[in-house]
Amino acid sequence: MVTERSGRNVKEVRYQPGENTLAPVQTLIKAAGQGRYEFSSRRFSIGGRDLVGWEKAERQSLTLVLLADVSHSTHPYINVMAEIINSLTGYFRMNKDRIGLISLSGAQAQILNHPTHNYRVVTKSLLSLAVHGQTPLADGMQKALAMIRLQKHRSPGSSSLVIALTDCYPEPLTLHSPDPFDEPAYRETVRAAKLFRKDKVPLLLINPTFSHHQEKDYFPGEKLSAAIERESGGRLIKLYRNMEFAQTQPSQGIPPSHRDILRIISGVEEMVGSRRLGEDRRIAG
């Protein structure tokens, strides 16, 4: 009566020990329907052929797409993302997950790795990324969605998750308006965020450049981060800048603190785990 299969019950089948899980209630209902219940003795007459089992859904595989911003402010966190992938390799391999990587650098986002089981190649690509000024955020988000759609077409039962590490200062800018949110790069990013909700693709956004706790004081990148979270139905991890370091080393990215690393690990593990269980509540509606 023990089976290694996990997942939700999807179909009643003939019970086979080791192949499926015994369904006691369904067995009794079937027996009663076949006249195997005696009212006088209040007993069922059940044989081996009458046993009903549950066929389980196969464990869901996950397609994880990483969006990596390689500006000065976010580049110090690239190593953290590579270490997280390495630490979860066994878990990913057990579930036959795929990981893809998109670099937010240059005029257009660059697809460095299509979703693959070769996690070492992905971490190697991550660690090879160099600092680059431009951040084509909207293009990267759209390419991540295209990756997910293609993978869902190939594996209809698979789950998905996009993790974006970015300071949310999209480019290029026209500089024709005093309000950054009138810039095409900002408008297109918000439009791309709405597509995540429409497609029911969960998004974990990690912004390591927050300076303000009050929304009224937000810089444009902080405002855009909040807008992406709101419009996509995803989750935002705000990591606050070490202002003392920023003032003494203005040209360098601020290295992540131990607390920052723990928050990133916790957020990634939570989102990956929730997708494994097929929990779509955060992006419903």
What is each PLM-predicted segment?
Residues 1-61:
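Acidic/polar low-complexity segments with low predicted structural confidence
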Residues 28, 57-116, 118-160, 170-171, 210, ...:
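Von Willebrand factor
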Residues 76, 127-136, 177-183:
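Flexible beta-alpha connector loops of hexameric P-loop NTPases
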